[in-house]
Swiss-Prot record:
Pfam families: LCM
Binding site for S-adenosyl-L-methionine: D132, D161, L162
Protein name: Putative S-adenosyl-L-methionine-dependent methyltransferase MAV_0301
Similarity section: Belongs to the UPF0677 family.
EC id: 2.1.1.-
Function, as annotated: Exhibits S-adenosyl-L-methionine-dependent methyltransferase activity.
Length: 314
């Protein structure tokens, strides 16, 4: 179902269901022979949610049957697992580097089923603010506490739609805009219209003093190319039809959740406002972590740029 300006969701619907897909991919990577990451909570989320489209990543028996239904389906599924594994490793390392540098305020925008508050070795005094839809945060906290898990930092949930006045809600929850903070917008930006993307980074910029850090993965050049979009849509249509047979469940058309609009380049926008910026493409990040993109699968993943930045003094 196409997005609307005031749509909402729980963990099994629309954008919320993508968080379960990410958790399933993290579970598959964690349980693999040579994992890049360790997320012991990912499997808990997937099991708690029950059967759905996310099952295809986390069930090894389904993966072995994939190519019987559609040639290259298993390769595409493995590519998605690799995508999420490298993305997770990138953000894990970003957060830990910021913590090592002494930053003790962490803001995770569109937190979804990100369990970093619960699994990363945060230094004493760290406060993590997680922002997302109320039902999503409730599912995560309730599920983890039912399994006896405890956050490894002071966790402050801020249940809010990011299209609302989240800076006000964040500060009312205790965020101190006079101190450095580390921000993440992981797996978020392509679900925002271009204007909302601009507003998101304007708000982050306004709340960031020197020493603050930011990481995000954003649409790269070519994201809106009509020929590439057509190839991606056709490729995903075939894979989605086959995957639906495997899990006996409807598979969300993720193309309907994204906004393929021309956007302000986030890296240059940040540089103009006093941030030191580093970037890596999806292919560069995959290579950095020893993963590869299968031949012919380039169009199955949207062009993605990983951005990390630090606010300069002065």
């Amino acid at each position: 179902m196409p997005r609307t300006d005031n749509d909402s969701w729980d963990i099994t619907q629309s954008v919320g269901a993508t968080a379960l897909g990410v958790a399933a991919a993290r579970a598959a990577e964690t349980e693999s022979e040579n994992p890049l990451i360790s997320d012991p909570f990912a499997r808990i989320f997937v099991d708690a949610a029950g059967k759905g489209m996310w099952s295809i990543y986390a069930d090894p028996a389904l993966l072995t049957k994939a190519d019987d239904l559609e040639p290259d389906l298993r390769g595409r599924l493995q590519l998605m697992i690799d995508f999420m594994a490298t993305r997770t490793a990138f953000f894990d390392e970003f957060f830990l580097a910021a913590a090592d540098a002494g930053v003790r305020q962490v803001v995770i925008l569109a937190a979804g089923l990100d369990a970093r508050s619960w699994r990363l070795p945060w230094p004493d005094g760290t406060v993590v603010y997680e922002l997302d839809q109320p039902k999503v945060l409730d599912f995560k906290s309730t599920t983890l506490r039912e399994h006896g898990a405890q956050p490894k930092a002071e966790l402050v949930n801020v249940p809010i739609d990011l299209r609302q006045d989240w800076p006000k809600a964040l500060q009312e929850a205790g965020f101190d805009a006079s101190r450095p903070a580390v921000w993440s917008a992981e797996g978020l930006v392509r679900y925002l219209p271009a204007q909302a993307q601009d507003l998101l980074f304007e708000r982050i910029d306004a709340l960031s003093v020197p020493g603050s850090r930011l990481a995000s993965n954003v649409p790269d050049s070519g994201f809106t190319d009509p020929d590439r979009l057509a190839r991606q849509r056709e490729d995903m249509r075939r894979m989605r039809a086959a995957a639906a047979k495997l899990v006996d469940a409807e598979i969300t058309d993720f193309d309907d959740l994204w906004y393929p609009e021309e956007r302000t380049p986030v890296d240059s926008w940040l540089r103009e406002r006093g941030w030191d910026v580093s970037t890596a493409t999806f292919a560069e990040l995959m290579a950095r972590y020893g993963r590869s993109i299968p031949q012919g699968a380039q169009d199955s993943m949207p062009p993605t740029l990983y951005v990390s930045a630090q606010r300069r003094a002065g």
